C-alpha cells in the first residue's frame, strides 16, 4: 500500500470510490487491467460512439470518468443518424436545415421531462429558463418517431445529481465552469474547441460507460483543477484517463493507452511527443486557471440562463468583457434581448470569471487590444503638403492617432524623404479601410533646410503643418515631440513660427478681420484674445518707433526703403498696392515664397502684390465708373471676369476711391501738397499737432471740429477731407492698411504721409475730459464688454474702433509699467478740472461756496454725506472753484488792485491745502509718454494763479 501511495499521482481518486450506488446496469465491473485497452477503441469505432451518444446517462457518466464533467454543462446538440454533435445552436439549426429538409416544414422541439412542445429553439430555451432554471446541462437528440423528425430534449441525471450533491441549495448557484472562455480576438474557434472536448470523450465502446465519480469529489476536483473553459488541466485529465490505480506500480511509459481525440489535442500542446495521433479539429492554447466564483441566482433576479448559449453574446464577451454602447445596441438587434438584460448578463459573466477592472484599466486594455484598429471618425481630413513625396514603405507614418482631434503628426528619426501618405494605409501590419481615413497630399517645391514646428488645432480634426523660416507647409524627417507647439506651455512666449505667421499677417493688415483672426488661431494655436492682443501691442510699438524703415513686398522679394515722409509714393500700376507697415523687425528680406503659406486654408485668400493686367484694369475701371461702391452681384461678376480674389477687388476699389478724393482735394486747394509736406516735417512735435487738431469747444469732438469754416481751421483741407472719407468708409477687411495706423495718444502719424498714401483710419485727438472718462472705465475693467463700449462711446463721442484701440494701448502700457496715471485713478485722485459732479450736487456746493467763499474743515463731513462724494473730491472741487475766481480776478483787476479784493490769503491757504497731494504727484497727471507733450491740461494750477496775482 505504501508503494502504491507513493507512485499514485496526487489528486487521483481510486476507481473503487468512483462507483455510485445507482450506476447504470450497463456499466461493466471495474477491472484493473482491461480498462486501459478499452479506451483505445473510440477512435476506431465511431459507430459505437455515435450509438452511445443519445444516452444521456451513459454519456454523462463517461464524461465524468474522463475528468471532463464541465464540458457537459450547457446545451449539447446531437444527431445520431448523421453522426453530428455540437454545442452551438446555430450550427445545430444549420445542420437540421441542410440535412433534414422535412424537419423545416413542421419542426418539433419536445422536452421529454415536461412533455412540452415548441416550434422553435428559442421557445424551448424560454421553457428551460422558466421550468428548468436550476438545470445547466441539456441534451438535444434527433429522433424519428413515426418517420417524423423530432428534436427531443433530456436532462442528464448525473449532471443534475452532482450539482445537487455538491451544493447546499438546489439550483441556486452557477459555477465558473459553466461560463465561456474569455479569449480576446479568438471568438470563432470556441465552438471547435468545445465540440472537440465533447465529441468523443463521453462514450466508451459498445455504449458502455465508465463508472461515475462521486458528486462531492467531482466538485472538489473542479474547484482545484478547472480551466475557465470548463476542461480539467492536461496533467489531471491525462492522469485520470491513462493511469488506473492498479497500474501504479508498473512503468508509465509502457502502459500509456491511446487517449480520446479531444484530450489528445490538449495533451499535445504540453507533451507533443506522448501521443502522435492527429485530429482534424484545430487545437487552441489553454488559458490560465481562474478561481471558482459561486454566484447565487437569487442575486440576479432577471438573469436568463438561455442567454448562455447565444453565440453572439459569447463571441462578444470573448472579445472584450466590457461592451461599449454601440456593441450593446448591435447585440440588442441580433439577439432580440433588451439592453438591460444584456448588461445583467455581461455583469454576471464578469462576476463568474472574476473580472473586475477599474475604468482606467478598461480604457488601457481597450487601447492595447485595438491599437491596430482604426476607429471610425466622422470624415476627418489630414492635409499634408510634403516635399518631396517618396514612394518608400520605410517612410510610412503611423497616422492612426492623427485622425483624432488634438493629436499631432510626427515622423520617426532616421528616415529620409519626408512624409509619405498612401492608400490603403498600413498600420502595425494591418491593412485599414481607405474610406475611414481620407488623406489629402500635395507637393510643393523643396525649400532650404530649416527647423520647423508642427501645430495641430484642437478644434478641428485637420492636421496642419507650418514651416518656420520659409512659412511653407513641409514635412521634415527630424520632427520630434519637443517641436510641437503647446500654447499652455509657452504661455506669453511665442515661438518663431507663431511670430512669423503673426508678422506676415501684420504686414498685410494691421487691423485683421474676423476671418483673418480665425485663420491665425488655427495656424498658430493661440486664442483669439492672444492674437488680438498681439496686434494691439504691435501697433502701439510701431507707432512709437521713429525713423524705422518700411518693407515694401515686391514680386520677387522685399524692397527696403527709408521712411521719408516728404517723398510721396508715386501711384502707378507697377507699385505694390499696399506697402507694409514699418516695424522694427521688418529689416530682413523674406523670399516671395512666403505667400504660399496662406494657401493651406481654402477659405483664406491672400492679397497678391503684383501688377494688374491691362484687361483686368479695363474691367475694374469700367465697373468703377458705373459705381464706386459695387454691390455683391457686381463683385461676384468681377471675380469671375478678372480672376481676382474678393479682397483684391475690395482693395482696388478702396484705393481707387481714395485716389479720386485726393484728386478732388488737390483741385480745391492747390497749396495742399506744400502744407502737407510742412506738416510731415513736423513729425514728433506732438504739442503743435495737438494745437492744430484741438477743437475750439470744451468737448473737442470731431463733429464740432468739422463744423467750423475753412478759414477758422489750422489744418489743411486735405486732412479734413481724409477724415471725412475715413469716417464714412467701413473699416472692415475691405480696407487695406496704410502706414499711419497709430495706437498711442499722438495719433497724427498718418498726417505725415503724402496725398497718394492716405491713412487707413481716422485719428482722433481726445480732450482731457474724454481721456478722463476712458481712464475711469479702464480702472473699473481692462476688458470692457459691449455694453461698456456703448456707454463710453455715448459719453465721449468717440467711435468704437478708437475706443477699442485706446484700451488696447492702455493695456500694453500698463503691462510695461508706462501707465503713470493708473495708480492715482485707482485711488480716486483725478486731475483738476475733470471732476464729474451731478447737477444737484453742483448746486449744493455752489450755494455753500457763495455763502462761505471757502471750505471749512468742520463742514467737510456734512458736504460729503449730502453730495455722496469723497472728501478728496469735495476738496478738489473747492480748489478748482477758487482757482477759477483767482484767475478771473487776475485778468480783470487793475495793477493797483490790492489783496483786499476778496480774501486771497485765505484762498491761497485753502488752495495749498487742497492741492498738496496733487502737487506732489504733478507728474502723475501727465498722460503716458505719448500724451505728455501733446495734450496738456487746460486748467491752470493754483500756483500759476498766485503767480498772476503777484504780477
Curated annotation (Swiss-Prot):
Residues 1-66, 198-249, 621-642, 661-702, 885-951 are annotated as: Disordered. Acts as a transcriptional repressor. Involved in the early stages of mesenchymal stem cell (MSC) osteogenic differentiation. Is a regulator of podocyte gene expression during primary glomerula disease. Binds to promoter DNA. Residues 232-244, 937-951 have a biased composition (Polar residues). This is Zinc fingers and homeoboxes protein 3. Pfam families: Homeodomain, Homez, zf_C2H2_ZHX. Residues 297-495 are annotated as: Required for repressor activity. Residues 661-674 have a biased composition (Basic and acidic residues). The gene is Zhx3. GO terms for cellular component: cytoplasm; nucleoplasm; nucleus. Residues 675-690 have a biased composition (Acidic residues). One of its GO terms (biological process) is negative regulation of DNA-templated transcription. It comes from the Eukaryota. Its main location: cytoplasm. A zinc finger (C2H2-type) spans 77-100, 109-132. Residues 298-357, 487-546, 605-664, 759-818, 830-889 bind DNA. It comes from Rattus norvegicus. InterPro entries: HD (IPR001356), Homeodomain-like_sf (IPR009057), Homez_homeobox_dom (IPR024578), ZHX_Znf_C2H2 (IPR041057), Znf_C2H2_sf (IPR036236), Znf_C2H2_type (IPR013087). Belongs to the ZHX family.
Amino acid at each position: 500500500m505504501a508503494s502504491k501511495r507513493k507512485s499514485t499521482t496526487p489528486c487521483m481518486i481510486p476507481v473503487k470510490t468512483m462507483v455510485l450506488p445507482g450506476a447504470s446496469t450497463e456499466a461493466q465491473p471495474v477491472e484493473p487491467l482491461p480498462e486501459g485497452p478499452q479506451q483505445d477503441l473510440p477512435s476506431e469505432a465511431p459507430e459505437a460512439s455515435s450509438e452511445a451518444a443519445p444516452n444521456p446517462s451513459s454519456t454523462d457518466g463517461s464524461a465524468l470518468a474522463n475528468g471532463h464533467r464541465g464540458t457537459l454543462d450547457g446545451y449539447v446538440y446531437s444527431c445520431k443518424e448523421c453522426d453530428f454533435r455540437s454545442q452551438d445552436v446555430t450550427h445545430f439549426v444549420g445542420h437540421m436545415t441542410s440535412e433534414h429538409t422535412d424537419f423545416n416544414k413542421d419542426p418539433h422541439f419536445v422536452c421529454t421531462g415536461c412533455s412540452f412542445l415548441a416550434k422553435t429553439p428559442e421557445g424551448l430555451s424560454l421553457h428551460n429558463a422558466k421550468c428548468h432554471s436550476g438545470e445547466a446541462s441539456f441534451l438535444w437528440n434527433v429522433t424519428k418517431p413515426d418517420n417524423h423528425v423530432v428534436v427531443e430534449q433530456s436532462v442528464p441525471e448525473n449532471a443534475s445529481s452532482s450539482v445537487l450533491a455538491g451544493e447546499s441549495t438546489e439550483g441556486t448557484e452557477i459555477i465558473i465552469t459553466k461560463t465561456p472562455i474569455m479569449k480576446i480576438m479568438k471568438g470563432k474557434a470556441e465552438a471547435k474547441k468545445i465540440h472537440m472536448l465533447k465529441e468523443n470523450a463521453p462514450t466508451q465502446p459498445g455504449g458502455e460507460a465508465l463508472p461515475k465519480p462521486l458528486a462531492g469529489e467531482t466538485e472538489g476536483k473542479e474547484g482545484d483543477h478547472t480551466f475557465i473553459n470548463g476542461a480539467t488541466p492536461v496533467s489531471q485529465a491525462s492522469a485520470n484517463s491513462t493511469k488506473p490505480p492498479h497500474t501504479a506500480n508498473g512503468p508509465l511509459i509502457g502502459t500509456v493507452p491511446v487517449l480520446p481525440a479531444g484530450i489528445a489535442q490538449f495533451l499535445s500542446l504540453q507533451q507533443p511527443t506522448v501521443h502522435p495521433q492527429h485530429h482534424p479539429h484545430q487545437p487552441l492554447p489553454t488559458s490560465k486557471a481562474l478561481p471558482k466564483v459561486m454566484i447565487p441566482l437569487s442575486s440576479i433576479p432577471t438573469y436568463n440562463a438561455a442567454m448562455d448559449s447565444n453565440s453572439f453574446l459569447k463571441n462578444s464577451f470573448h472579445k472584450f468583457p466590457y461592451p461599449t454602447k454601440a456593441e450593446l445596441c448591435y447585440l440588442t438587434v441580433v439577439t432580440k434581448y433588451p439592453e438591460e438584460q444584456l448588461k445583467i448578463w455581461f455583469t454576471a459573466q464578469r462576476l463568474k470569471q472574476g473580472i473586475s477592472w477599474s475604468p482606467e484599466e478598461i480604457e488601457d486594455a481597450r487601447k492595447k487590444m485595438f491599437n491596430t484598429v482604426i476607429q471610425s471618425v466622422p470624415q476627418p481630413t489630414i492635409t499634408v503638403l510634403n516635399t518631396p513625396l517618396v514612394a518608400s514603405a520605410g517612410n510610412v507614418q503611423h497616422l492612426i492617432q492623427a485622425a483624432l482631434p488634438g493629436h499631432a503628426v510626427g515622423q520617426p528619426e532616421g528616415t529620409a524623404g519626408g512624409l509619405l501618405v498612401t492608400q490603403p494605409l498600413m498600420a502595425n501590419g494591418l491593412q485599414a479601410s481607405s474610406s475611414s481615413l481620407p488623406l489629402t497630399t500635395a507637393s510643393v517645391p523643396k525649400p532650404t533646410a530649416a527647423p520647423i514646428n508642427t501645430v495641430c488645432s484642437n478644434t478641428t480634426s485637420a492636421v496642419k503643418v507650418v514651416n518656420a523660416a520659409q512659412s511653407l507647409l513641409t514635412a521634415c524627417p527630424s520632427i520630434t515631440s519637443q517641436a510641437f507647439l503647446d500654447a499652455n506651455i509657452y504661455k506669453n512666449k511665442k515661438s518663431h513660427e507663431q511670430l512669423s505667421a503673426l508678422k506676415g499677417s501684420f504686414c498685410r493688415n494691421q487691423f485683421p478681420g474676423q476671418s483673418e483672426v480665425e485663420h491665425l488661431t488655427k495656424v498658430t494655436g493661440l486664442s483669439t484674445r492672444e492674437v488680438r492682443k498681439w496686434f494691439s501691442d504691435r501697433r502701439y510699438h510701431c507707432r512709437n518707433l521713429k525713423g524705422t524703415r518700411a518693407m515694401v513686398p515686391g514680386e520677387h522679394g522685399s524692397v527696403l526703403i527709408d521712411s521719408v515722409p516728404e517723398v510721396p509714393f508715386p501711384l502707378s500700376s507697377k507699385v505694390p498696392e499696399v506697402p507694409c507697415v514699418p516695424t522694427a523687425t521688418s529689416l530682413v528680406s523674406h523670399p516671395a515664397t512666403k505667400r504660399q503659406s496662406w494657401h493651406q486654408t481654402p477659405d483664406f485668400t491672400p492679397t497678391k502684390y503684383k501688377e494688374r493686367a491691362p484687361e483686368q484694369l479695363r474691367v475694374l475701371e469700367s465697373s468703377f465708373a458705373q459705381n464706386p461702391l459695387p454691390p455683391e452681384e457686381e463683385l461676384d461678376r468681377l471675380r469671375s471676369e478678372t480672376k481676382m480674389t474678393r479682397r483684391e477687388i475690395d482693395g482696388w476699389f478702396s484705393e481707387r476711391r481714395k485716389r479720386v478724393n485726393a484728386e478732388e482735394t488737390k483741385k480745391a486747394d492747390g497749396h495742399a501738397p506744400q502744407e502737407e509736406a510742412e506738416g510731415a516735417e513736423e513729425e514728433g512735435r506732438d504739442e503743435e499737432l495737438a494745437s492744430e487738431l484741438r477743437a475750439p469747444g470744451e468737448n473737442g469732438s470731431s463733429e464740432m471740429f468739422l463744423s467750423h469754416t475753412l478759414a477758422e481751421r489750422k489744418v489743411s483741407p486735405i486732412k479734413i477731407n481724409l477724415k471725412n472719407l475715413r469716417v464714412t468708409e467701413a473699416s472692415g477687411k475691405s480696407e487695406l492698411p496704410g502706414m499711419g495706423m497709430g495706437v498711442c495718444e499722438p495719433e497724427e502719424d498718418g498726417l505725415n504721409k503724402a496725398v497718394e498714401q492716405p491713412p487707413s483710419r481716422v485719428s482722433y485727438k481726445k480732450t482731457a475730459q474724454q481721456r478722463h472718462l476712458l481712464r475711469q472705465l479702464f480702472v473699473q475693467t481692462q476688458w470692457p464688454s459691449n455694453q461698456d463700449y456703448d456707454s463710453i462711446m455715448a459719453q465721449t463721442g468717440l467711435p468704437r474702433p478708437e475706443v477699442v484701440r485706446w484700451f488696447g494701448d492702455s493695456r500694453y502700457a500698463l503691462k510695461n509699467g508706462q501707465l503713470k496715471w493708473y495708480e492715482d485713478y485707482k485711488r480716486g485722485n483725478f486731475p483738476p478740472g475733470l471732476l464729474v459732479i451731478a447737477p444737484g450736487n453742483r448746486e449744493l456746493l455752489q450755494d455753500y461756496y457763495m455763502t462761505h467763499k471757502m471750505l471749512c474743515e468742520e463742514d467737510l463731513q456734512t458736504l460729503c454725506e449730502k453730495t455722496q462724494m469723497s472728501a478728496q473730491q469735495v476738496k478738489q472741487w473747492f480748489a478748482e472753484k477758487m482757482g477759477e475766481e483767482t484767475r478771473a480776478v487776475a485778468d480783470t483787476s487793475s495793477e493797483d488792485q490790492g489783496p483786499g479784493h476778496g480774501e486771497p490769503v485765505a484762498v491761497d491757504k485753502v488752495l495749498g491745502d487742497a492741492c498738496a497731494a496733487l502737487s506732489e504727484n504733478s507728474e502723475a497727471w501727465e498722460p503716458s509718454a505719448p500724451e505728455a507733450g501733446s495734450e496738456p491740461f487746460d486748467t491752470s494750477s493754483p500756483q500759476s494763479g498766485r503767480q498772476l496775482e503777484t504780477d
